[in-house]
Amino acid sequence: MKYNNILNVDGVFADLGVSSHQFDSSKRGFSIRFDSEIDMRMNTNSSFDAKEILNEYSENQLSNIFFEYADLRNSKDIAKTIVDARSLGKIKRTSQLNEILSSFLPKGFENKILAKVYQALRIEVNQEIEALKEVLLQLPSLVKKGGTISFITYHSIEDRIVKRFIQNGCFNSEPSKNEFGVSEIPFKKTFKFIAPSLKEVKSNNRARSAKLRSAIKI
């Protein structure tokens, strides 16, 4: 925008996460439905992919991303199992990973647990949390007074970040304050959040976890 001499905007709308096109691709490793190479790069020009995480990260690093990016309480056990498995040979395909994790998949919840693991890997590969925070931090100076920001989130990790930024103007649990001790909160929420209706979820199951949060620049 700076190239086109656009310094401020009336609003920003962001639909976060992975596109249906990426989930439906049988060659990128985004989905648990296909047996494919574990890639997960949104930017295919990047040399860093999910295979590198699975085969090169330490047990502690793996545990951290599964805990931080997937809320998996047994992240340490999952990490240890992956490290043990890769000692027998590199983990390259989704079918391998799914089999390695089979002992952590209670009947009826297999897809839910696998989806969380894949989510954590994808977030780490694409540095999604860092990118989201970078965007949010630019908004106070980018959006005009009275302008609107709206974000659709699809999982609790990114939703917590957006919610906290709208509430506090930062990513901490308390608002940032200026030198006089006055809270500096650049946005005011317009509503709590909007979730999809049962009718919408029925017609588009991928919308089931979506939340829309919106705020006005003050």
For the regions a protein language model found, what residue spans apply to each?
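S-adenosyl-L-methionine-dependent methyltransferase catalytic core, i.e., the SAM/SAH-binding region
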Residues: 1-218
